C-alpha cells in the first residue's frame, strides 16, 4: 500500500504532512540512518586523535572524504543500508557494514575494523537521536517560533491603541488594550524560548555497559 495522508500511521505524516515536511530531514528513517552514519564517522575521526598505533598512519586529509559520506547522504545510500539490513536484520550493524564498504571504495580498508570499535548500538542511537532533535530545533522549530513572536509583536504595535473590555474572576473589570494583551503572549513565548535554549542535549557513549570495557582492555594506557 502506498503512503498517503489517509493511511499514514499518525496525523503528523497524514493530515499535517504539508506542514511537517521540513522536519523529514531530521525525523524520517532516512534521516535517522544519516545521523547514525554521522556518529560513526565522527567517532572514527575522534579515535584518530588518540595514540592508537593502528591509526597513526591514517591521513587526516581524508577526514573531509569521510564527512562527505553523511554530508552528501542520499536516498540511494539509505536504500543500500536497508538492503544490507535484510541480511543483518540489525539496523546499526547495517550502517557499520555500509561504512566498511565505503572504506573499501576509498582505499582505506586497513582501518575499517575501527568503525564502531568498542561501541554498542545504543551508543550510536542515543547520540544520533539527540543530535537530530538539536538540529531540528535550531534549523526549523526555533526559527518558526521567532516568526510567530515577530508577528505577535507587530500586531501588538498595530493594535496598541484599541481599548477592550477586560475581566477578572469572570466579571467585567478595568479596561485594557488589545495590543497589550497580544504582547502578553509574545512575552510568554519568549520566556519559553529562553528555557528551550537551556535544554541540554545529552548523549550516551560508553560501550555495552557504559564502562568503556572494550576500550580499556584494548588500550589500557589511554584514559
Please place each PLM-identified region on the residue numbering:
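A helix-coil-helix interface module used to build multimeric assemblies
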Residues: 2-215, 219-223
Amino acid at each position: 500500500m502506498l503512503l498517503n495522508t489517509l493511511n499514514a500511521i499518525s496525523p503528523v505524516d497524514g493530515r499535517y504532512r504539508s506542514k511537517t515536511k521540513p522536519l523529514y530531514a531530521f525525523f524520517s528513517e532516512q534521516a535517522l540512518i544519516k545521523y547514525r552514519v554521522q556518529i560513526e564517522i565522527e567517532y572514527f575521526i575522534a579515535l584518530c586523535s588518540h595514540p592508537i598505533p593502528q591509526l597513526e598512519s591514517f591521513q587526516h586529509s581524508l577526514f573531509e572524504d569521510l564527512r562527505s559520506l553523511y554530508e552528501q547522504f542520499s536516498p540511494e545510500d539509505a536504500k543500500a543500508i536497508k538492503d544490507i539490513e535484510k541480511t543483518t536484520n540489525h539496523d546499526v550493524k547495517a550502517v557499520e557494514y555500509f561504512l566498511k564498504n565505503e572504506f573499501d571504495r576509498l582505499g582505506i580498508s586497513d582501518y575499517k575494523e575501527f568503525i564502531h570499535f568498542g561501541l554498542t548500538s545504543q551508543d550510536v542511537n542515543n547520540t544520533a537521536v539527540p543530535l537530530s532533535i538539536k538540529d531540528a530545533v535550531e534549523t526549523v522549530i526555533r526559527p518558526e517560533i521567532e516568526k510567530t513572536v515577530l508577528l505577535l509583536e507587530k500586531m501588538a504595535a498595530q493594535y496598541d491603541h484599541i481599548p477592550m473590555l477586560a475581566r477578572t474572576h469572570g466579571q467585567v473589570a478595568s479596561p485594557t488594550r488589545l495590543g497589550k494583551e497580544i504582547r502578553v503572549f509574545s512575552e510568554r513565548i519568549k520566556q519559553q524560548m529562553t528555557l528551550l535554549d537551556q535544554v541540554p542535549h545529552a548523549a550516551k557513549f560508553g560501550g555495552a555497559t557504559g564502562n568503556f570495557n572494550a576500550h580499556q582492555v584494548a588500550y589500557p594506557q589511554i584514559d
